[in-house]
Design a protein with these regions (language model features):
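Alpha-helical transmembrane segments
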Residues: 1, 163-165, 187-198
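Short hydrophobic helical membrane-anchoring segments positioned at the boundary
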Residues: 115-119, 123, 127-128, 133-150, ...
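Hydrophobic, membrane-inserted alpha-helices
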Residues: 155-165
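Toprim catalytic domain recognition across nucleic-acid enzymes
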Residues: 1-26, 60-67
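Short hydrophobic/aromatic-rich motifs at helix boundaries and adjacent loops
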Residues: 18, 185-189, 212-214
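Donor-sugar nucleotide-binding helix/loop cap in glycosyltransferases
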Residues: 26-157, 274-279
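Generic signal for short, ordered secondary-structure residues
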Residues: 22, 29, 107, 188, ...
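Hydrophobic alpha-helical transmembrane segments
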Residues: 166-187
Length: 324
């Protein structure tokens, strides 16, 4: 890895003004997730960002001990294409003016709605990658040649292991090659599953970016650091919550907000209320259900064009600046 001059232990301010979904795509590492590949946390962070920027409003209803939370589309002008895909997905669940969050999990367990969600989700990902994460832009921060070689080695290793195991399984004199094939298969599968940033490497620019985002994540996860260096306003807290969602640690920031902010401010804050009334939990459950149902469908049958939402057109959708 290239050496950089950056030496800070943590970051208590957002390092760069990249869209939350872009931060999620580049600076979170998981099995099966490549660098520059947004995932479900990025999708949820996009929704949280739309709430924070007042494109979505949070409405609540209380009946006895029952609390219900809804989303309401407030405006759409000026959104990026990937944000418009999210709006189209949410609009599908409108009843009157309100989006009924507790109805989304039920609907996404059905094939028709799950197909639609998967189509939206794929188009959302592709829209982000086209605008912010094309090959040239990713190449400025990350070199994935090593990751490609590792995956090739992995697939060749699995194939070779299967062949050797097949040829030796019934030969009592070939126990050593048989067990060696099992070891090769395990090693090869690990090579295939490794996150890209382990065999690949960051450029100097990319290394500095990822170290700053890691340190910002460390700050958000450490309650003592937040207590020592708290955000200066509710608006900053809300922005931190958006990025925490992208980084997969939203619960840490919500807990810190409970301790640091007055109850009245919390009750007037759409971002906090969305979590407190269970809106975020409902959304997470719904999206997991939709993806699970869609995956089952893809295994069981060939998905046709039914439910295809089409591409977003031009019109009045504004364009933000490039990431990085």
């Amino acid at each position: 890895e290239p050496k950089i001059d950056y030496r800070a232990d943590y970051e208590h301010e957002i390092p760069y003004d990249d869209p939350p979904a872009v931060v999620n795509a580049i600076y979170t590492s998981k099995v099966f997730k490549g660098v520059g590949e947004p995932d479900m946390n990025g999708f949820k962070a996009t929704i949280m960002d739309l709430i924070n920027r007042n494109y979505l409003k949070v409405e609540t209803r209380t009946k006895g001990k029952t609390k219900r939370v809804f989303l309401k589309i407030n405006k759409e002008k000026g959104l990026e294409d990937f944000e418009m895909y999210v709006m189209r997905f949410l609009r599908r669940f409108k009843k009157g003016d309100l989006i009924e969050l507790d109805e989304i999990p039920k609907k996404l367990s059905k094939k028709r709605h799950a197909r639609y969600f998967k189509d939206v989700y794929d188009k959302w990902k592709n829209s982000i990658k086209t605008k912010f994460l094309n090959k040239e832009k990713i190449g400025r921060i990350f070199i994935n040649k090593g990751a490609k070689y590792m995956k090739v080695f992995g697939f060749i290793g699995v194939a070779l292991a299967i062949i050797v195991a097949f040829l030796t399984i019934q030969d009592p004199l070939a126990r050593l090659p048989f067990f060696a094939s099992i070891l090769l298969a395990i090693t090869s599968i690990i090579a295939i599953l490794l996150p890209e940033d382990i065999p690949g490497h960051w450029t100097r620019e990319g290394r500095e970016h990822i170290e700053k985002w890691k340190n910002f994540k460390k700050y958000l996860k450490d309650f003592s650091l937040i207590k020592e260096y708290p955000p200066e306003s509710v608006e900053i807290w809300n922005k931190y919550l958006v990025y925490a969602t992208a980084l997969g640690i939203a619960d840490n920031v919500i807990k810190a907000m409970k301790f640091q902010l007055p109850q009245q401010e919390l009750e007037e804050n759409d971002m906090y209320v969305f979590h407190d009334y269970g809106g975020y939990a409902l959304l997470s459950s719904a999206l997991a259900t939709g993806m699970s149902t869609a995956t089952e469908i893809e295994f069981d049958e060939t998905v046709g064009d039914t439910g295809d939402i089409g591409d977003i057109g031009g019109g009045d959708m504004g364009g933000g600046g490039d990431a990085f």
